[in-house]
């Protein structure tokens, strides 16, 4: 599993998730033109994207070949709440998007700083 931390955007008064990391998307199987479904879970505060040949959505493209997933609706804010950053976890055929709370963000920042310190030592 690979993951990345992103800012939750705002577009036309709605919360927006913009995924454009080619390596992570392709590594999870989300290729340009592949279909997928979105499940918004308000109670668990998570959004699931799952590859599905009969899916309602299609992976878009940028620059002709790079995959993009753009989620922009009131459902995004409804599911993720009022957060400023999200954690995106990429698994084969499934992407999980969840909010990063202030406490979690501090832990991630400390872990990142510690890793940087170890790398320099």
Region roles according to the model:
Residues 1-3, 15:
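N-terminal intrinsically disordered, low-complexity, charge/repeat-rich segments that act as generic
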Residues 42-61:
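Short glycine-rich, basic-tinged beta-strand/loop micro-motifs
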Residues 55-59, 103-109:
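Short, charged/polar, Gly/Pro-enriched secondary-structure boundary elements
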Residues 110-117:
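Detector for the mature cores of small, proteolytically processed
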Residues 119-121:
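Short acidic-hydrophobic catalytic motif
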């Amino acid at each position: 599993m690979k993951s990345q931390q992103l800012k939750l955007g705002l577009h036309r008064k709605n919360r927006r998730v913009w995924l454009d990391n080619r390596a992570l998307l392709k590594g999870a199987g989300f290729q340009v033109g592949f279909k997928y479904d979105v499940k918004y879970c308000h109670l668990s505060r998570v959004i699931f994207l799952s590859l599905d040949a009969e899916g309602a959505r299609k992976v878009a493209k940028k620059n002709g070949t790079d995959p993009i997933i753009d989620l922009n609706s009131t459902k995004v804010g409804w599911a993720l709440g009022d957060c400023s950053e999200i954690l995106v976890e990429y698994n084969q055929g499934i992407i999980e998007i969840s909010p990063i709370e202030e406490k979690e963000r501090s832990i991630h920042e400390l872990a990142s700083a510690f890793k940087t310190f170890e790398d320099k030592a």
